[in-house]
Amino acid sequence: MATIQLLNIKKQYDNDIFVINDLNLTVADGEFLVIVGPSGCGKSTLLRIIAGLEKVTSGELYIDNELINNREPADRDIAMVFQNYALYPHMTVRGNLEYGLKNRKTPKEDINKRIAHVAKLLEIEPFLDRKPQQLSGGQRQRVAMGRVIVRKPRVFLFDEPLSNLDAKLRAHMCIEIKKLQRSLKTTSLYVTHDQLEAMTLADKMVVMNKGTIEQIGTPMEIYDCPKTIFVADFIGSPPINFLDRQALEKHLGNLFSCSKDTDILAFRPEAILLGEYPDKGPVFHTQIEFIRPIGTGCHVLTRWNDILFTVDIKERLTSDYGQKLNFTVTHQNFHTFNKKTGNRT
């Protein structure tokens, strides 16, 4: 296990654009930290910097209080799982698992013990004599993880390891990875663009945008109290609803007080009360545009004046296009932001 510290990390390429700009981050010993953000935000570059596959332009990287900026990747005691499984196709599962250990001249008895332990842990014992092409996608991903686990590294790095799997298998593997990390207690960093993966796996979550950190916190802290418009919009499915303060006051009046800096309001799709409760908050008289059934209820696209909202209804609606849907958003369920700064007010 290990503690990781990144101090004022900058990564700049020849075009003078900072891929990562003045980033500071601490990962606690044994913590599972998930970095989430859109494509191009710098999350995979950050992982590669920690692994030693990319050099920083400036800043300091520490593992257990030891500066490792100039350490070679092989000397950092870090193991990485990639999106493509990176297995040797001509080797058996056993051969893939033992390859790195043999290169490090690990005693044969120790190799056999480690492989037996990992094969049992990952439930790949029946596949040890098979080659990768004889395995399913999920089985190959388990082998890829097994290959890094047998090394017993200080740090695990996961670079979108589940993106090649179908939705059902991805959900299952999320649970398996979380259980595995809890068992091993190895400091882990996991990169994904999938917010559901991030919220499922993370002890702590980092939301990145354009090379900087927008917010750090537990998944529920970030969901319940987004610090910026970007975080509010990026985290949550269906996405949050935004409303211009002037539009609200134009149609409904000044129903509650908020700071002068507030010009954007937002509410989560599930944070509504069906019906009219004017004593609890603004009432929206809307028309249904589209209903998306989800089994336990439905997501409804509604129109209020010229604004579209998505609301999460916990019942099966039989209404159709153009029919009325009235709901209330309580005062405490509004998030408030400043458009110019993008920050929460």
Curated annotation (Swiss-Prot):
Subcellular location(s): the record lists: Cell inner membrane
- Residues noted as binding ATP in the record, renumbered to the chain: 37-44
Annotated GO molecular function terms are: ABC-type glycerol-3-phosphate transporter activity; ATP binding; ATP hydrolysis activity
* PROSITE patterns for the chain: ABC_TRANSPORTER_1, ABC_TRANSPORTER_2, UGPC
Q: Which EC class does it fall in?
A: translocase
Q: Subunit composition?
A: The complex is composed of two ATP-binding proteins (UgpC), two transmembrane proteins (UgpA and UgpE) and a solute-binding protein (UgpB).
The similarity comment for this entry is: Belongs to the ABC transporter superfamily. sn-glycerol-3-phosphate importer (TC 3.A.1.1.3) family.
Q: What does this protein do?
A: Part of the ABC transporter complex UgpBAEC involved in sn-glycerol-3-phosphate (G3P) import. Responsible for energy coupling to the transport system.
Q: Quote the protein name from its UniProt record.
A: sn-glycerol-3-phosphate import ATP-binding protein UgpC
- What is the organism of origin for this protein? Bartonella bacilliformis (strain ATCC 35685 / KC583 / Herrer 020/F12,63)
